[in-house]
Amino acid sequence: MRKETVRNQRCAGTKADFLLALFIGRSPETETACPASSGMKRSGIEVCTAGEWVATKEIKRLQRIKMIELWNVNKTYETGNKALRNINITVEDGEFVFIIGRSGSGKSTLLKLLLKEVEPTSGKIIVNDMNLGKMPRRYIPKYRRRLGMIFQDFRLLKDRNVYENVAFAQRVIGASARSIRESVPTMLTMVGLSSKYKFYPQQLSGGEQQRVAIARALINRPEILLADEPTGNLDGHNSMEIMKLLDEINKRGTTVIVVTHSHEIVDRMKRRVITMDRGTIVSDEKKGGYTHED
């Protein structure tokens, strides 16, 4: 496909499509494998142009690249609690995965392992070709920037407005003032909060607060978005609106993993469902529903 054709296809979408393509997953300037005979080379790595990036994401999806791999992972806490037992999971680049199960089944421990908040007792965890067990401690903060995280309780800074909450995530990684001025308004437009950038968290609804949290999680263009009960404090309508946003984000290439207890959301979305119980995986359905009994 010629560059002009790819670029024209990319520009044919809506403004929201463009914003999502720009900010979700890897940016157009990310160093990644480009289609054969295209792209420039930087230090031996081919670099895609903006138009080629979209086509490259499709190529990667077709190649079914593994984003996350857990091999025989076990986690026993110092208390003796065996949180995870012989966990084997592969999540491909661009997948949307639900993880369900009753409280204490190991779901949160699984997310903590991916964030490197805790270490496995045994086994191997690979994220985007990186062996987390061999990762130097000094590299962990940089690694975590490649992950986005949203929580049930939003975890917003109550004394800062919407704009400042999202900008904070860029300031902590040393982003320039110019970068913040350009990227934060764009991200707020993407999540539908451009008109409320001066509002404080207590002035927003629960659904709006979660949108701020999503914008903050995505502002640094993560490859993976982890969501721990993202709709737990929301009503049915706002829950589905948040899931529609996560679904759209996923369709633009970001790998999304959602821990939830919501039967309605899981049944309606029809995505991959991993069910956990007592630290083990009891089922893994590619397009499942909520079959676990609480």
Regions inferred by a protein language model and the residue ranges of each:
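Helix-to-loop junction immediately C-terminal to a conserved catalytic motif
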Residues: 115
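Conserved ABC transporter NBD signature motif
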Residues: 123-131, 143
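Short coil-to-helix segment of the ABC ATPase nucleotide-binding domain corresponding to the Q-loop/switch region
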Residues: 160-167
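Conserved ABC ATPase signature
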Residues: 200-204, 208-210
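Hydrophobic anchor residue at the start of the ABC signature
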Residues: 214
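A short, proline-enriched helix->beta-strand linker immediately N-terminal to the Walker B motif
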Residues: 219-223
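Catalytic Walker B motif of ABC-type/P-loop ATPase nucleotide-binding domains
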Residues: 225-228
